[in-house]
């Protein structure tokens, strides 16, 4: 996938073929990425979302965890403040850094549904909900119907379908109610960020 900023302006983020470096190329990216180019690409992506009529809630690095470098993390927090967004931090050092700035961050390790076994996934989700510790937790779930078209293009369709099956089940609804779990999205976190100084 290519960048949204002009390739010539973000060359330190690109492979030899002009594509954005992938998560498995993270070590090289962290060595060569120029901070000004990271900023250009982040701005281009946020602006593209806004130009599409969508309202972003947060900035994150997707598969790159918390940006991989302190300067990239700090840039991301500054951009989030400028755009009125939250920052999604996965790892404890970054979460601690946000809390030290008076900004909300999740309290527990992140759960990614792609890392759960498909066999017994519903039971695993149920146990995780029953054992959920107090505080703010983040689960990255990827629900989708897994229809014929998605099966042809998405090798992860089974993960998505099993997420959908559990999340829309009466069991999930009952567990959320009985365990008194409040489900929020990043809009709630974004609102908390905008009400705090954080600098």
Functional labels for PLM-detected ranges:
Residues 52, 126-153:
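Catalytic grooves of carbohydrate-active enzymes
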Residues 99-101, 117-120, 147-158, 197:
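Histidine/acidic-residue-rich catalytic or RNA/ligand-binding cores of hydrolases
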Residues 1-5, 46, 79, 125-135:
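Short amphipathic alpha-helices and their capping/turn segments at secondary-structure boundaries
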Residues 27-39:
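Active-site mouth loops of central-metabolism enzymes
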Residues 87-88, 154-199:
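C-terminal domain-boundary segment and adjacent tail
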Residues 59, 139, 176:
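Conserved, mostly hydrophobic/aromatic
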Residues 1-29, 155-158:
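Active-site gating loops and adjacent loop-to-helix segments of metal-dependent hydrolytic enzymes
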Residues 35, 43-104, 109, 115-121, ...:
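Catalytic domains of cell-wall/extracellular-matrix polysaccharide-remodeling enzymes
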